[in-house]
């Protein structure tokens, strides 16, 4: 039975965690479920689709909004319940929700090794937009020098313009929902300063013994000076000191310089995910 959920109850979150465990145990890798987002759903609109068989959760598809231009769709189906059309039913139920919210397109996130997931995306007319490696650090970061001229401080809402400029310089676009991120108690956005000059930014999340690194950017004019490696080591040491035992991040597969930086600090690739673009206006 399909449930269109407005917010996720404690029971649903526990069922999601168990379903995630089953899928990762069977398939390896990881799932991009963004637990902090799932636990903070507002309940004002349908953002999650759950497929139940009695009290057992067999399938899930979540909608994740990143700005006004795109939604990401991430889902999973229990290994024992595959080839029953559950994934197709979940995606077919999700697309009208995307259209109702006036998004021009959605990105369906598919594990690179999932032939069935790729086929489902292509059957809906999706095209491969890009791919990303998911990396994890399970041990101490590599050792290295710490530049005394480089400092870190927590960004606040008043820093929004500075953080936006740094993200635009590095990535070509700002982070969606930046002001809310800067005001959040559940995640930290840090400013990287060199002799008092803002030269970079990085966002950290924590959930239990797992942590995530996002939006890591160094001003192109300051790259090549070891600042990125220095900062990444510092924040990984900080997160581990706070109890994190698993630190994750993502990088585009064609960003070889960033991948080299992350692996030099000790991160390893756990999976590669393909992002398939669905043009929603063409899916009537």
Model-derived segments and spans:
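Conserved acetyl-CoA-binding loop-helix of GNAT-fold acetyltransferases
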Residues: 83-96, 123, 215-218, 224-241, ...
């Amino acid at each position: 039975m399909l449930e269109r959920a407005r917010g996720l109850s404690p029971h649903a979150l526990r069922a999601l965690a168990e379903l995630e465990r089953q899928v990762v145990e069977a398939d390896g890798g990881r799932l991009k479920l963004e637990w902090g987002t799932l636990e903070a759903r507002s309940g004002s609109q349908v953002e999650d689709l759950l497929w139940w068989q009695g009290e057992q959760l067999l399938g899930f598809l979540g909608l994740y909004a990143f700005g006004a231009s795109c939604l990401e769709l991430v889902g999973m189906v229990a290994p024992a319940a595959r080839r029953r059309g559950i994934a197709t039913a979940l995606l077919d139920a999700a697309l009208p929700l995307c259209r109702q919210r006036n998004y021009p397109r959605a990105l369906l996130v598919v594990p690179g090794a999932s032939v069935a997931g790729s086929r489902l995306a292509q059957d809906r007319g999706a095209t491969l937009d890009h791919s990303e490696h998911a990396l994890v650090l399970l041990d101490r970061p590599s050792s290295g020098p710490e530049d005394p001229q480089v400092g870190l401080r927590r960004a606040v809402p008043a820093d929004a313009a500075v953080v936006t400029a740094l993200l635009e310089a590095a990535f070509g676009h700002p982070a969606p929902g930046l002001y809310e991120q800067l005001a959040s108690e559940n995640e930290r956005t840090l400013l990287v300063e060199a002799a008092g000059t803002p030269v970079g930014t990085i966002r950290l999340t924590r959930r239990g013994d797992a942590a995530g690194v996002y939006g890591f950017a160094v001003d192109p004019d300051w790259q090549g000076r070891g600042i990125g490696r220095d900062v990444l080591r510092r924040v990984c040491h900080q997160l581990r000191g706070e109890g994190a035992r698993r630190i994750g991040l993502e990088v585009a597969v064609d960003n070889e310089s960033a991948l080299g930086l992350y692996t030099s600090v000790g991160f390893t690739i756990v999976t590669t995910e393909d992002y398939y673009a669905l043009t929603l206006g063409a899916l009537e």
